[in-house]
Amino acid sequence: MSKTLKKKKHWLSKVQECAVSWAGPPGDFGAEIRGGAERGEFPYLGRLREEPGGGTCCVVSGKAPSPGDVLLEVNGTPVSGLTNRDTLAVIRHFREPIRLKTVKPGKVINKDLRHYLSLQFQKGSIDHKLQQVIRDNLYLRTIPCTTRAPRDGEVPGVDYNFISVEQFKALEESGALLESGTYDGNFYGTPKPPAEPSPFQPDPVDQVLFDNEFDAESQRKRTTSVSKMERMDSSLPEEEEDEDKEAINGSGNAENRERHSESSDWMKTVPSYNQTNSSMDFRNYMMRDETLEPLPKNWEMAYTDTGMIYFIDHNTKTTTWLDPRLCKKAKAPEDCEDGELPYGWEKIEDPQYGTYYVDHLNQKTQFENPVEEAKRKKQLGQVEIGSSKPDMEKSHFTRDPSQLKGVLVRASLKKSTMGFGFTIIGGDRPDEFLQVKNVLKDGPAAQDGKIAPGDVIVDINGNCVLGHTHADVVQMFQLVPVNQYVNLTLCRGYPLPDDSEDPVVDIVAATPVINGQSLTKGETCMNPQDFKPGAMVLEQNGKSGHTLTGDGLNGPSDASEQRVSMASSGSSQPELVTIPLIKGPKGFGFAIADSPTGQKVKMILDSQWCQGLQKGDIIKEIYHQNVQNLTHLQVVEVLKQFPVGADVPLLILRGGPPSPTKTAKMKTDKKENAGSLEAINEPIPQPMPFPPSIIRSGSPKLDPSEVYLKSKTLYEDKPPNTKDLDVFLRKQESGFGFRVLGGDGPDQSIYIGAIIPLGAAEKDGRLRAADELMCIDGIPVKGKSHKQVLDLMTTAARNGHVLLTVRRKIFYGEKQPEDDSSQAFISTQNGSPRLNRAEVPARPAPQEPYDVVLQRKENEGFGFVILTSKNKPPPGVIPHKIGRVIEGSPADRCGKLKVGDHISAVNGQSIVELSHDNIVQLIKDAGVTVTLTVIAEEEHHGPPSGTNSARQSPALQHRPMGQSQANHIPGDRSALEGEIGKDVSTSYRHSWSDHKHLAQPDTAVISVVGSRHNQNLGCYPVELERGPRGFGFSLRGGKEYNMGLFILRLAEDGPAIKDGRIHVGDQIVEINGEPTQGITHTRAIELIQAGGNKVLLLLRPGTGLIPDHGDWDINNPSSSNVIYDEQSPLPPSSHFASIFEESHVPVIEESLRVQICEKAEELKDIVPEKKSTLNENQPEIKHQSLLQKNVSKRDPPSSHGHSNKKNLLKVENGVTRRGRSVSPKKPASQHSEEHLDKIPSPLKNNPKRRPRDQSLSPSKGENKSCQVSTRAGSGQDQCRKSRGRSASPKKQQKIEGSKAPSNAEAKLLEGKSRRIAGYTGSNAEQIPDGKEKSDVIRKDAKQNQLEKSRTRSPEKKIKRMVEKSLPSKMTNKTTSKEVSENEKGKKVTTGETSSSNDKIGENVQLSEKRLKQEPEEKVVSNKTEDHKGKELEAADKNKETGRFKPESSSPVKKTLITPGPWKVPSGNKVTGTIGMAEKRQ
């Protein structure tokens, strides 16, 4: 049964029972009894007697009643409706102790008997039965009166008191009548009984007790005395505490209440219930004097909280208000009496649309009373009365094969890949046959030749399916493997139902559509262009349907076809609605069929999976993929690809003109305008050919739950981009299979924690970790403590089941965990169609492809990103789309490319079947000009929230600190997001406005202080499944370190790195829905472990920079922005110099000048002696500038695998920590000119002091390996080249030991990383090419001078980099290797090959010592392109090992460095550091 308004407790739940006795004379009840029918009141308790002499009431068991409580029963005997005297007589009749049943007076039951009798309830409900009991008791002492004349056999004063109208009105005005009303023009009433009975009346006690024992068989004859009377004072009950109203007929027009013991007119009608103002007439309800047959097998009768009866069909797991036993006794509509409705019909009193009628059996609505309609047709000689009349085959339905009428046909069919080749219809109710609708051409059934349309399916492989549901039979066919045979028994002789204009049809296919649940295959698929004025449209059953004219649709002359489908009943004009669906164990819970405007929802089979979907909705998009041009089977395949539990948004068209096979029935008999199809292909909708009021009058809102949900959203404070989901779970032995988190404070929400493997929640598939728990069995949990929530779950466990309402965040465009298709996210960049479009979208004509020619400059890329679907798309769908267009790029300037456009060819070569890597390579090979063949995507306007569109969200598209938009388009980052036309490490993915943020601490990622709303901007979720060794990532930070939580490392081949969306340096904002702000490191681990095999992380993209413990001040974001504090806006020249590796950057032979120069303009003043041609593809560049890291760190390589990306990220991570220590390397890395703009440059003033520059700090010294090589070789680009091998041991130590903030642990890890780094560094030097460079080795004297001029820097604050002091003993041999790590590598590769082996051996030893000393400045001459290739090979080796390889080191005595804030170096120290480079000019 669908969810209705949340109900409060019925008065029945407040009934109290107790056993009382009294100390006194027998029969002297110890409590005062007040009220009574003679006063028009229920009997109720007065004060309890406490006289010591006798009559004192004593409660034996139960809770003592309170004075004023209404007395309902005494020892099980109802006393409501009895006089006070008779009530006391019943009490005295029993021995003490006696059992009393009482209830506190409320809004429904109070002392006023007249009030309760004036209310109208559903027949069979608790209240309706109580009303009948009251009347039974009343008629013991009173006789109803009427103004009509006596009928034959009626005795005045026995059956009725026959009085005049004047006498009746006098009684009514005097208040002597408990009930009054009219029926058939006559007045009826029930007078109050006299307080004292006449001497001729028998004692009522015997009658009360006797009738109570034989209640089911011996109904007293006046129980329905006023059952047909139209009450003058009828009203709806007001439940206690504003309960939902359980009574119905709020209009008060219940033709209900006459009474006569022998008149059948009195025994048939009952007003029925509705949650609104409606009446469902159960006029065929079995009366109490009739013996009811048992319910059908697996049916159950139950009561709602308000006492209303409903029926549960366990066969189909559905509920209904209709008694299945009454179906066989249902009358034809024309045989019903006035005021009576046929079985299954309901009367709706709607304040907006007036009165209309609902046929629940056929899901139809109409304004005309079906009984009046049927009688009118009968008078006109029309035999056919539409769906209200039972179909012929329904009247002959049987579950017994022996009672079938017709010829039995047996067939054996072999299942092909396309199924069995026939469609089925029927099975919507247990009393309906399943019949063959069509036999598909060339299918197994057609080849067998034995099956024909109309055949009733009797038996499948020996299992009788008569009475089975549609879904059950489809599932049986699905379970048959391909190439296996199935034996069918069919019965020929039953025609197909006449009312099959739009039936539920299922193709019995090999992979039948969504769930085994009635996915339909229509016979005709018409394009709207085919509809021409005057053309005749044939319905599926071959009958002539509607003639299309220039003005619109003319309905058929047959009035029986004039119905309003419930699908269009809720809207007055066409609207596009996005509905989130969840795929259940058996599918999405609905069936589809072809229609002229697309695939239409044929039937709702299981509404819990497709809440909000309605019959008749036209499907436009599935998961943001346009399916209007797809065939029925293609749409089926699209739906089938989603796994169980997947969230699938569906864009549907609802409302507006009905489909061409139906028209709306209006209250008038005027011609019905169902709309024009002239504007179908117009981009702008034409005016509606009918006023909205006509549609409203013909389309009443039928679904009370839908009205409730719509109204609920008006008042409910529901966060945007969330959806609420109801999950019903049955308890297993191990429980419900999930854990609960949160509830630690009054403002803390409750979340779903771990989903237990193989538990009930996991098997159900809908519940997820991090879902916010809203309600448990209808009880809100917001604000409740953790213990209270557990108590609620304990209560639910006792019941064996629980209904959970959870709220889930919707991340538009984000990858759903269950779906590994990135295709689903492609069109989300443009969003989904807006909701206010009023046209009737039709299948658009295929878009014509067009060519777009892009030209780029040498220093830029083409400026677009291609996304490729991982899963094989449906036929005809191009899997490659434009995922992003970079602002200001060639793609943006041309104006012809839009996000979502499909790319079918590159330079005339089709790419439809090519992989993503091949496409990227193809575009890169095109040089500076590329021609794209584009098929424009249909216009999209974003989801309702408007936050889903990349074009609508420039803030997300261009984020500061080089954060890539790729975070919002998750998928295979390495495969999907490489920049087209640029090399791996130089992809130009950001506009100039991105880089200007680098000098603004406010926009840095490090700024995490603020509201949670601000914190979550730009974040994206990642759900990981635990691998054999965990989730594959490690954390840094926590409250105890006074910093946030960051991704520290990614394990090789772990789930995190395979996912491709997590990167080193990303900040963790939430773990399984719980915010991480202010939580400890230990708590973060606990949250991850609590998620079981899955964890849901909300990440904010980082820059690859991981702050050190102590550098991070969560209360002061600027304090963590040490890197940026001294920066000035980056000049464009330096920007391009550091960003674009493919450009030729002029550099000084002494490359320190490039890194230490104050302004980028100074580069122009220095004449370059040598230039270095930079290789574009250098993923091994580990020590490239921080600017490049910040800007393009998030851009994964387009042609390299994860290893390159991981290695790069790890290096950046290390450089980040170096940057925290602020060495000259760091400013160079980050825009060296920028940072050093505020630092006195010793380069020009005191070149002799240059060696001091290298001794600023251990970290700086390590960085200097890159720094110095930059000067000596090709400037910053040279440094970038050498990054692959120049990751310092210091940096590696930080990466390896980042979890431990202690210095001792840092030292241990440092030593280990040093040994590893030294070993790998020596190997990296053995470049097979053997080519050498000149001017690699400087004089030993110069090297010694460098060593001696080194000074220790007290400026560094890194705690873990405390080094040992070593004697500074330098030989010529070692001096030649006192250059930085990169220099050492270069020396080996370009230096003296004769001594290479010796050098390598020494390098291993020196690299171990190097961390304890400051590296010497290295001088490297210009490198050739061949040597760059060698470096690339060496870097590849580094990537394989994931280690950073120091090249050389020299033992230099160093002092301990104490942590502290970074200070700008004084002039003398800096100049001393820089002097050597000047000297070498």
Swiss-Prot record:
Membrane disposition: Peripheral membrane protein
Biased composition, class Pro residues, residue ranges: 191-202
Region described as Interaction with PTEN: spans on this chain: 410-492
GO annotation terms (biological process): apoptotic process; intracellular signal transduction; signal transduction
Region of interest (Interaction with LPAR2 and GRIN2B), ranges: 851-938
Molecular function per GO: ATP binding; frizzled binding; guanylate kinase activity
Tissues in which the UniProt entry reports expression: Widely expressed.
Source superkingdom: Eukaryota
Keyword Protein biosynthesis: no
PTM: Ubiquitinated following interaction with HPV E6 protein, leading to its degradation by the proteasome. Degradation is independent of E6AP ubiquitin ligase complex.
Pfam family of the protein (one): PDZ
PROSITE patterns assigned: GUANYLATE_KINASE_1, GUANYLATE_KINASE_2, PDZ, WW_DOMAIN_1, WW_DOMAIN_2
Keyword Ubl conjugation included in the entry's annotation: yes
Localization (cell): Cell membrane; Cell junction, Tight junction; Nucleus
Biased composition range(s): Acidic residues: 236-245
UniProt-annotated stretches for the region Disordered: 182-273, 542-570, 821-843, 939-976, 1170-1481
Extra remark beyond the main annotation: MAGI3 PDZ domains are used to design peptide ligands that bind and inhibit PDZ domains.
PANTHER family: MEMBRANE ASSOCIATED GUANYLATE KINASE-RELATED, MEMBRANE-ASSOCIATED GUANYLATE KINASE, WW AND PDZ DOMAIN-CONTAINING PROTEIN 3
Name by which UniProt lists this protein: Membrane-associated guanylate kinase, WW and PDZ domain-containing protein 3
